[in-house]
Structures are given as structure tokens and as C-alpha cells.
Amino acid sequence: MAAAAAAPGGGGGEPRGTAGVVPVVPGEVEVVKGQPFDVGPRYTQLQYIGEGAYGMVSSAYDHVRKTRVAIKKISPFEHQTYCQRTLREIQILLRFRHENVIGIRDILRAPTLEAMRDVYIVQDLMETDLYKLLKSQQLSNDHICYFLYQILRGLKYIHSANVLHRDLKPSNLLINTTCDLKICDFGLARIADPEHDHTGFLTEYVATRWYRAPEIMLNSKGYTKSIDIWSVGCILAEMLSNRPIFPGKHYLDQLNHILGILGSPSQEDLNCIINMKARNYLQSLPSKTKVAWAKLFPKSDSKALDLLDRMLTFNPNKRITVEEALAHPYLEQYYDPTDEPVAEEPFTFDMELDDLPKERLKELIFQETARFQPGAPEGP
């Protein structure tokens, strides 16, 4: 769910926690836009933020931490795909610890599997997201540089855990009033495994088309961490111009947008496309010349454009890595390899989730959230 923990439009006027707040009567359930939020008595004073395909987000006052938080109500149990995405996000975020990745503060749900209809995920409240920010203003070069650095800093951690995010886009980058940025929405994340063609990988792959790397559309397997770098390149281009760089209307239109700017791929680049049908299609297209980045972004920093060029490289094997991007001259004022933490160990899913029925996924969600239940032993 895009921008899950983000409040719209800079969060203006949102009441902050104050002493003497009167909690709701125990047992009383607050309702937000017709949706009951069974999160009291710890969380009260709910205010609507937004909603996605399978849930709603509200802000609330946390009486324990004495601050406002975001609560995502998820009702996924009717659909296998929603269960899968919910479980994957919970599994990853409970194990990740990084300043530029949204964390989970608390999870509320019914005490029994049979009674569990919804899951409430409590996260830090972030006032806006990059999508909303770009709709409302043109960013300065300093802001672009700082946001890009934080995206890459978070992505370095994610990739060090051997995870692909697979759905990086402006609405999945949460921002607060002090310009701190956190990556959210890990529902499409996967273990990086270039040899494995995940069951249902392409059919289930619904990441926003505009930020998809060309190899996702051209190959049937073997994705690497470079797909996330492509998405970050698209985000950088959007920060420079306030508009998406490759706004394709459908699959082929998306490819045509990419080739219209990058030019026709070289023979060497074509050779890395496994899918012969896709390779033949590209070879059948009229030759296109690369458009100079400075022509597309005449007012932009030349170092930013050099980094953009290295991210938006057609051949994934030649695309810059996250570590190389962090060390690029454009980011030199922030670059500090001693303050860019990596995961303690690679992340592993105990099992491939794609083929599990929703009933089994519900059981796994119930187990995964048990540590937050009253009386549960302290989790890691």
C-alpha cells in the first residue's frame, strides 16, 4: 500500500501528543470513515490519512510513547495475494533495523486465529511522501541530493540483506518535516536470487510500470539488485523535473519511452537478453539515438546527471551498484562509509510464499505477530 505511514500534504495542523489527553472508554472502538479501528486504549484520537487496495491508514496518539503514530489497518484474509504481501512485509520489517527503512513499532490483532479479521501495524508517523512533495513544489538541488543520499543509504542496507525491494517509487518514500526519509512498502520484496525463476514472479509482479527496469519486461528470470537502482534513477530524474521520466501507458509503450531517451541498445546489451522473442522485437525497431541528459535537464547539476546516467543504464550488468552510487561525487558532502550500516546477516524466507493457500498464510501472519500480544516474551 503506497505511502502507508505517510500523512498527506505535510501534515499541517496535526495535533501532537499533549499531557492530560483523555483516552477513550475501554472497550469503545473508534471509527474512521466508517472503518472501526480496534486499537484502544493505548491508541486514541484517530485521524484519517489514506487508503490502499486492502487497508486504511490513520494517525493516532500513542499513550505509552506520548507521540502520534501511523496505524495501518490491513484486512487481507480474503485474498491469497494480499496475505502474501502482508506476511512478506511483516517478516522483513520486523527483522530490519535502519534509519532509512520504516520500522514496525507494534502490531495489534485478535487473540485467536479464528477471530483474526484484521491486522493493525503501528509505525512512525511521517508527514508526507516524495510523491506528494513533488506534486506541491520543485526541490532544490540540496534537497534532491539529501533525499537521494538517504534513499541509497537505506537501499545499501536492504541489498546487504540480499533483499530486492522491487517497488521503489516516490509514494513509497516517506518524509517528515525535518527531511528524514524512510523507505516503506516491502510487500513485493524478494530474496535476490538471479538463478531462480520465482513461481508466479511475473504474473504477480504488479510494481508500478514507470519505475520498472527494462530487463523485468524483457527477461523471464534472473533479476538482480540492479532493478532497484534503475527505479532510484527514475526517482532522481523525477526529482530533477517534477515529472516521471518514462510514463509508459502499457508494456510496449514503456519500452519505447526508455529507448526514446537511452537510444537503441548495443549488440552487447542485446546479448544479455535471454528471451529471444524480446531480443528479436528490439532488433526489429528503427535505430534511435541517445538523448543528452543535459538537454532533458538543462538546469540540473552536472554531477547529478552523471550519476543519473550510470543508474539509467540499459544493461543491468553495467549499471552502477548502490555502494558505487553512494561514493559518487554528487553525494560527496554526505558520503560516510562508516555511517552507512549493513545488515548483520543475509535475510532468508523460511519458505517460498507464492504457492501457499491463504489459510496457511493467515496462520503464518498469526505466528509472526505473536510477539506483540500481551504477555508475550520480548522479541529480538
Swiss-Prot record:
GO terms for cellular component: caveola; ciliary basal body; cytoplasm; cytoskeleton; cytosol; early endosome; focal adhesion; glutamatergic synapse. It comes from the Eukaryota. This is Mitogen-activated protein kinase 3. It comes from Mus musculus. The modification N-acetylalanine is found at residue 2. Gene3D superfamilies: Phosphorylase Kinase, domain 1, Transferase(Phosphotransferase) domain 1. The active site is at 167 (proton acceptor). ATP binds at residues 49-57, 72. Coiled coil: none annotated. Its cofactor is Mg(2+). A motif (TXY) lies at residues 203-205. One of its GO terms (molecular function) is protein serine kinase activity. GO terms for biological process: animal organ morphogenesis; apoptotic process; Bergmann glial cell differentiation; BMP signaling pathway; cardiac neural crest cell development involved in heart development; cartilage development; caveolin-mediated endocytosis; cellular response to amino acid starvation. The modification Phosphotyrosine is found at residue 205. Serine/threonine kinase which acts as an essential component of the MAP kinase signal transduction pathway. MAPK1/ERK2 and MAPK3/ERK1 are the 2 MAPKs which play an important role in the MAPK/ERK cascade. They participate also in a signaling cascade initiated by activated KIT and KITLG/SCF. Depending on the cellular context, the MAPK/ERK cascade mediates diverse biological functions such as cell growth, adhesion, survival and differentiation through the regulation of transcription, translation, cytoskeletal rearrangements. Keywords: Acetylation, Apoptosis, ATP-binding, Cell cycle, Cell junction, Cytoplasm, Kinase, Membrane, Nucleotide-binding, Nucleus, Phosphoprotein, Serine/threonine-protein kinase, Transferase, Ubl conjugation. It catalyses: L-seryl-[protein] + ATP = O-phospho-L-seryl-[protein] + ADP + H(+); L-threonyl-[protein] + ATP = O-phospho-L-threonyl-[protein] + ADP + H(+). Residues 43-331 form the Protein kinase domain. InterPro entries: Kinase-like_dom_sf, MAP_kinase, MAP_kinase_CS, MAPK_ERK1/2, Prot_kinase_dom, Protein_kinase_ATP_BS, Ser/Thr_kinase_AS. Dually phosphorylated on Thr-203 and Tyr-205, which activates the enzyme. Ligand-activated ALK induces tyrosine phosphorylation. Dephosphorylated by PTPRJ at Tyr-205. Autophosphorylated on threonine and tyrosine residues in vitro. Phosphorylated upon FLT3 and KIT signaling. Ubiquitinated by TRIM15 via 'Lys-63'-linked ubiquitination; leading to activation. Deubiquitinated by CYLD. Its main location: cytoplasm. Belongs to the protein kinase superfamily. CMGC Ser/Thr protein kinase family. MAP kinase subfamily. The TXY motif contains the threonine and tyrosine residues whose phosphorylation activates the MAP kinases. Binds both upstream activators and downstream substrates in multimolecular complexes. Found in a complex with at least BRAF, HRAS, MAP2K1/MEK1, MAPK3 and RGS14. Interacts with TPR. Interacts with ADAM15, ARRB2, CANX, DAPK1 (via death domain), HSF4, IER3, MAP2K1/MEK1, NISCH, and SGK1. Interacts with MORG1. Interacts with PEA15. Interacts with isoform 1 of MKNK2 and this binding prevents from dephosphorylation and inactivation. Interacts with CDKN2AIP. Interacts with HSF1 (via D domain and preferentially with hyperphosphorylated form); this interaction occurs upon heat shock. Phosphorylated by MAP2K1/MEK1 and MAP2K2/MEK2 on Thr-203 and Tyr-205 in response to external stimuli like insulin or NGF. Both phosphorylations are required for activity. This phosphorylation causes dramatic conformational changes, which enable full activation and interaction of MAPK1/ERK2 with its substrates. Dephosphorylated and inactivated by DUSP3, DUSP6 and DUSP9.
